[in-house]
């Protein structure tokens, strides 16, 4: 009801979604994304759960009751969710938390993050993973058997096609 009212009164409806919450599965998160799509937001944000110092989740993590996603698991889940939003023509305006003095690599002294899928280029990992999956799917579909493939693409997509640190090449 609140989402309808927000749109009715001319406000931009945006939703935020977290992946990797305690006991949440990939299927749970896909179903959450589908439920959000039905609410017709204009924009969404996708955040992976990070374990922050001195929080109830940190206590669960320290007691072995919560196991955070790895970066790879979070990227895998975010790729599928982003694809759902893209297919529904809903703009994903952020993926991953913005790097700050407190939200940074857990190895940094000032970081409040003690565990979880932190990566400063999380969105690029997701988008380049989506490009990689699509290109591999096309290569398989057309049964391409050569060792080298030339891909022509819009220059704005080149970084994601190549991948973070050239991981797709």
PLM regions and their residue ranges:
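C-terminal scaffold of the Radical SAM
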Residues: 2-147
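Short, non-transmembrane amphipathic alpha-helical segments
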Residues: 3, 161-169
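Short, glycine/charged-rich beta-strand-loop motifs at protein surfaces that mediate ligand recognition
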Residues: 121-127, 155-162
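Short glycine-rich, basic-tinged beta-strand/loop micro-motifs
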Residues: 142-160
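Active-site proximal loops enriched in glycine and acidic residues that flank catalytic Cys/His/Asp
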Residues: 48, 96, 153-155, 165
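Short phosphate-engaging motifs
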Residues: 53, 157, 168
């Amino acid at each position: 009801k609140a989402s309808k009212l927000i749109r009715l009164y001319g406000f931009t409806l945006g939703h935020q979604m977290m992946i990797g919450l305690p006991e949440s599965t990939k299927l749970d998160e896909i179903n959450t994304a589908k439920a959000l799509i039905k609410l017709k937001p204009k924009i969404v944000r996708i955040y992976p759960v990070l374990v922050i110092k001195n929080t109830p989740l940190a206590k669960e993590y320290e007691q072995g009751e919560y196991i955070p996603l790895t970066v790879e698991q979070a990227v895998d889940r975010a790729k599928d969710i982003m694809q759902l939003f893209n297919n529904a023509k809903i703009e994903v305006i952020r993926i991953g938390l913005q790097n700050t003095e407190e939200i940074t690599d857990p190895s940094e002294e000032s970081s409040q993050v003690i565990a979880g899928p932190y990566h400063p280029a999380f969105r690029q990992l997701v988008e380049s993973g989506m490009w990689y999956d699509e290109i591999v799917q096309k290569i398989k579909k057309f049964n391409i058997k050569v060792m080298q493939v030339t891909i022509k693409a819009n220059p704005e997509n080149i970084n994601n096609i190549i991948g973070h640190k050239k991981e797709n090449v």
